[in-house]
Regions:
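Non-catalytic, topology-defining segments of multipass membrane proteins
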Residues: 1-192, 196, 205, 213-233
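C-terminal transmembrane module of eukaryotic multi-pass membrane proteins
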Residues: 223, 229-292
Length: 292
């Protein structure tokens, strides 16, 4: 699958896709309902491939790898460490897979890579003088830590009977609808907090940490200042105001925790084999890092 069929390189060697950057059809005006419906059910589209994948991972995380809700009624270091370990393994496997294939193995070299250069490994602007080490440190020590704090405290609050819990046998339709709406809520929440943290004082205080990555890699996705992580993972608080199921929290946090990896991969497409590649739709956000 040759790069030239999908884009071209400028005189500095930067890859520019032919595909135009655009908003999803559900976010355009005037409304385009037919286009929106086609996008929702197309591949790639609203549900596939990414969002149903994150829903599936979140459901497995709750129903198979998490203790029952009543176990969260008492806050303790053991519960927190279990949650932190579970989330760390998810991040290590998912982000690590992108990083290993694209940046360690360099399985497709710079084919479809926006910036022909590789991450900076000798710069004082990053912790430890390395972009990759800086990003991994912030991902786990701030990102996964704060993600796990939100998870443990919200589930503790729910276990104390402070929310209206649903019964799956009686509310399966509501349960499924809420899961399918998570991506919409995440997009809206991210848009709002992202506009907020680009307010100059907050940008200088917190968001500039993330934007040091002008040539991002997968680990850049969750490499943020702790203040930004608090804003970012606050998306899970919404479900305290609706009939509640713990899976809503886990799926939302998994979506927030994992989805930045492909969006910051630094490539337009990933080659599956010599003749097949798939679009990871990351060019718009790459331009945001490059120019803002």
């Amino acid at each position: 699958m040759k790069e030239k069929y999908f884009g071209e390189r400028d005189r500095k060697g930067h890859y520019i896709p032919k595909k135009r950057v655009s908003y999803p059809p559900i976010f355009i005006w005037p409304l385009a309902p037919i286009q929106a419906l086609k996008w929702i059910f197309s591949v790639p589209g609203y549900f596939l491939p990414w969002n149903l994948f994150y829903v599936g991972i979140g459901l497995v995380s709750w129903f198979i790898f998490s203790p029952p809700l009543e176990d969260y009624a008492e806050l303790g270091i053991t519960n927190f460490l279990l949650v932190f370990a579970k989330n760390s393994v998810l991040v290590l496997i998912y982000y690590g897979a992108f990083h290993y294939r694209l940046y360690m193995k360099r399985a497709q070299d710079i084919d479809f890579k926006f910036n022909p250069r590789w991450p900076i490994e000798n710069s004082k602007q990053f912790l430890f003088g390395s972009q990759t080490k800086d990003n991994i440190f912030l991902t786990f020590c701030s990102g996964v830590f704060i993600w796990s704090c939100f998870e443990i405290f919200i589930l503790w609050f729910a276990a104390k009977n402070n929310v209206k819990l649903i019964n799956l046998d009686e509310s399966m339709f509501y349960f499924v609808v809420m899961l399918l709406l998570i991506h919409l809520w995440r997009d809206l929440h991210f848009y709002l907090i992202h506009r907020l943290i680009h307010y100059e004082p907050l940008y200088k205080w917190a968001h500039k940490t993330h934007h040091r990555n002008i040539n991002p890699g997968p680990w850049s996705g969750l490499a943020m200042h702790p203040i930004e992580h608090i804003f970012y993972f606050s998306c899970a608080l919404l479900y305290l105001f609706f009939p509640f199921h713990p899976a809503f929290i886990i799926v939302t946090l998994v979506h927030a925790g994992l989805s930045p990896a492909p969006g910051h991969a630094g490539f337009e497409r990933i080659k599956a084999d010599g003749e097949t590649s798939f679009d990871i739709d990351s060019y718009a956000h790459y331009l945001h890092h490059k120019h803002f």
